[in-house]
């Protein structure tokens, strides 16, 4: 039985490289997108032409209903989600004092809460199976902070903290939760 990876933000630069690496390593890859449908479809076509297994799925990680629908569709197509890669995110370069409350909420919703919701959607089955991995793609700004990216930095710092706490909570069930900064995200994920 092939292992299934669900990758959010799978149509973008880092996400598409993660999808390629996983597909090349024999994974069934759910390439999830919100805004990059054409790029996601092009990536899946490229992978299928090479005899690799991938499908496109729409997912707005800022919306719980969209997450639940996406996870259900991935399960229907591929079965058990063995690996979740929370890669989707958004960033704006803007002074914190100029940021609207709506933009602040969007940063937290997409960069932190979206990953938490995606994890919550796949974890019950992983816990039942005593198997699975959650990888959260973070940023060096979550560790160091960045001027004009205060909300993004805070959300990514929260994602790092979430990952550490989640790892402790799910380890007893045989599940791993790890984070990688995007500077290292291009490294192979084959050993996870």
Please state what every model-predicted region is.
Residues 95-96, 103-108:
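Substrate-binding pocket helix/loop in short-chain dehydrogenase/reductase
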Residues 181-188:
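Conserved small/polar residues in nucleotide/adenosyl-binding loops
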Residues 11-12:
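Conserved glycine-rich cofactor-binding loop
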Residues 139:
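Residue(s) in the substrate-gating loop at a strand-loop-helix junction
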Residues 119, 155, 163:
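Active-site helix of classical SDR
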Residues 27-41:
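Conserved glycine-rich Rossmann-like NAD(P)H-binding loop of the short-chain dehydrogenase/reductase
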Residues 124, 168-172:
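Alpha-helical segment proximal to the catalytic Tyr-Lys
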């Amino acid at each position: 039985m092939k292992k299934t990876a669900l990758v959010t933000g799978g149509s973008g630069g880092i996400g598409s490289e993660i999808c390629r690496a996983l597909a090349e390593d024999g994974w069934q890859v759910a390439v999830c997108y919100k805004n990059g449908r054409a790029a996601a479809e092009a990536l899946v076509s490229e992978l299928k032409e090479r005899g690799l297994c991938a499908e496109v799925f729409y997912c707005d990680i800022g919306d719980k209903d969209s997450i639940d629908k996406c996870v259900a569709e991935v399960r229907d197509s591929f079965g058990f989600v063995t690996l979740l890669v929370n890669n989707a995110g958004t960033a704006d370069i803007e002074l914190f004092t100029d940021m609207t409350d709506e933009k602040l909420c969007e940063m937290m919703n997409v960069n932190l809460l979206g990953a938490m919701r995606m994890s919550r959607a796949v974890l019950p089955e992983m816990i039942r199976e005593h198997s699975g991995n959650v990888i959260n793609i973070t940023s060096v700004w979550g560790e160091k902070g960045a001027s004009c990216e205060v909300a993004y930095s805070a959300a990514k710092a929260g994602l790092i903290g979430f990952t550490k706490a989640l790892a402790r909570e799910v380890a007893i069930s045989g599940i791993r939760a790890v984070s990688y900064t995007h500077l290292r995200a291009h490294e192979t994920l084959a050993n996870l």
